[in-house]
């Protein structure tokens, strides 16, 4: 079993299993990739998370930097398959907090390793979900999208909110577990379990790459 599959107690897992939760969904015919909030303010310094948050309160630290290569591979594969790629970042804020949040323009910078390509949409969102007051659902429908392949940060926060709202807008949602990261490994795993049980299908990068590669070959 994968780590997130054992994130909840066995007695709770049994309840979900008996209820038939967590049924595997079929890949859609026209997926899009949603990259949630992979920007400087959520990465922070290349340090353990407990140290990184002392510099920037929203940091995930080294765990975020370590996830960038897997996100890059997902993006390379998706682009080669002709999928739309959409990014979200927070709306800039000058709000004062006890520790700096780095949500100004510099904090919203997407690292070069996973930067948008020309023509790819970057949405600035006012709240956790990529759908709230952004026009994302309308944009996706105009593109003919029927399913979402979701990655980014934080698994328990904006990724989850975007996945749940994607489900509520009647898209089939997939969350790529090894392309998501969080300040808390516990909340990362627990959120993956919860999303998989109710709102999305949690998949690995390898599963996703295999699907997209096959799809690209069939379309050629």
What residues fall within each predicted segment?
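Active-site-adjacent betaalpha module
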Residues: 1-32, 76-81, 98-220
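A short, N-terminal amphipathic alpha-helix
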Residues: 65-84
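Short beta-strand segments at enzyme active-site cores
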Residues: 83-90, 176
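Catalytic metal-binding/acid-base residues of hydrolase active sites
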Residues: 35, 39, 91-92, 154, ...
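Acidic-leg catalytic submotif of subtilisin-like serine proteases
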Residues: 28-44
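A short acidic, glycine-rich active-site loop
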Residues: 55-69
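Short, flexible, mixed-charge acidic loops at enzyme active sites
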Residues: 44-52
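Glycine- and small hydrophobic-enriched segments that form the cores of compact globular domains
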Residues: 71, 94-95
């Amino acid at each position: 079993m994968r780590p997130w599959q054992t994130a909840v107690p066995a007695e709770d897992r049994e309840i979900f299993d008996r209820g038939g939760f967590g049924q595997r969904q079929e890949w859609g015919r026209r997926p899009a990739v949603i990259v949630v909030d992979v920007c400087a303010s959520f990465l922070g310094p290349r340090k353990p998370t407990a140290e990184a948050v002392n510099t920037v309160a929203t940091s995930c630290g080294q765990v975020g930097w370590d996830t960038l290569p897997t996100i890059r591979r997902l993006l390379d594969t998706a682009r080669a398959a002709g999928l739309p790629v959409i990014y979200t970042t927070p709306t800039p804020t000058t709000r004062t907090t006890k520790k700096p949040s780095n949500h100004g323009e510099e904090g919203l910078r997407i690292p070069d390793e996973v930067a948008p390509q020309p023509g790819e949409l970057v949405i600035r969102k006012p709240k956790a979900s990529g759908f709230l007051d952004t026009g994302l659902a309308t944009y996706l429908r105009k593109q003919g999208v029927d399913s979402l392949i979701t990655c980014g940060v934080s698994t328990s926060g904006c990724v989850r909110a975007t996945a749940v709202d994607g489900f509520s807008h009647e898209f089939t949602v997939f969350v790529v577990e090894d392309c998501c990261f969080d300040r808390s490994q516990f909340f990362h795993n627990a959120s993956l379990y919860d999303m998989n049980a109710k709102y999305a299908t949690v998949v690995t990068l390898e599963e996703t790459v295999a699907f997209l590669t096959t799809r690209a070959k069939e379309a050629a």
